[in-house]
Amino acid sequence: VQPKQNILHLPVYQPGKPISEVKRELGLTDVIKLASNENPFGCSPKAKEAIVSLLDQVSIYPDGGAVDLTHAVAEHYGVKPNQIIFGAGSDEVILMIARAFLTPNDETISAFPTFPQYKHNAEIEGATFIEVPVDENGKHDLKAMLAKVNERTKIVWICNPNNPTGTMLSEREIVSFIESVPNHVMVVLDEAYAEYTVNEEYPDSISLLNKYKNIVVLRTFSKIYGLASLRIGFGIGHPDVVRSINQVREPFNTTSFAQKAGLAALQDHEFIRTCREANAAGIRQVTAELDKLGLPYFEAHGNFIMIDVKRPGQAVFQGLLQRGIIVRHDPGWGYPTKIRVTVGSEEQNRKFLEALEQVLSEVAVS
């Protein structure tokens, strides 16, 4: 049995190493994972209570339309319920957008490096994927991306803040780009890390939906809300666009646990505020030490920092791993001397910085 020709070259997604695997492989008892941009403070206590309340309903199918959560999200963001589509993580919404709109005759554009699932899902549909390198500061080169738009372009993907670089586009930049692309081009604004941003120039993208019908905004409960293992995220767009995405959505694609926990997490504003402030403090803590070490880094607007360690990134990754610190280095990013580290708690950040200084003394500068 032969698979589709256009998937033969596709890589299998490689997540950050799990803690249990590192403990087992290296015989360690104390391991800190700063590889997958998870919330170091977990999730809202209210979300935990919501999960426990459903334990006796495991045998019951979830609400296929996630009605309660849909209405809560609609109220939270000031949109209509028919503008919202849920997925098992926002990455499933990416999959559904590609499935609903891309054909082998289409082209689709993103920055490079960025979240790999845009390319992955576009190529499954046979579309031509065009990657435009970020600039020297790790930001989307919107002018160069716009130059690639033509009559075959169907979707432009913009990750903001961008993963893995952590950089941010302002509302002025986003609006200018949207107004420059033809109406037949969908602009997907992936804002998985939006709740972490404290920069006043960060776009209020959801309000832009009132003016632009060709944009879709993606959000997730996996990051600041701390529900990564439950897999739930959503897209907000024009009702006609959302209707098309819904047509390719699998039934019961989000669990009762995810829906109920998401509802509780959405309403715990104090938890989100605390996490946002702690993350901002963590960025200051880490970057202050990086400045002392003379290590460059991109501006961080999410909950992670991309650092130029001035040494082979894989060697630094391995050195940190031996000390029980899991970070991320991906040769596919095109940055051989850079690592990406999640901002942890104050103690986790301190242990990372101590380990990093030790590793830097052992690995030769490139």
Can you say where each PLM-predicted feature lies in the sequence?
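Phosphate-binding glycine-rich loop
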Residues: 59-107, 125
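Active-site pre-lysine segment of PLP-dependent enzymes
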Residues: 123, 140-151, 164-187, 191-222
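Conserved PLP-binding catalytic core of the aspartate aminotransferase-like
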Residues: 280, 289-323
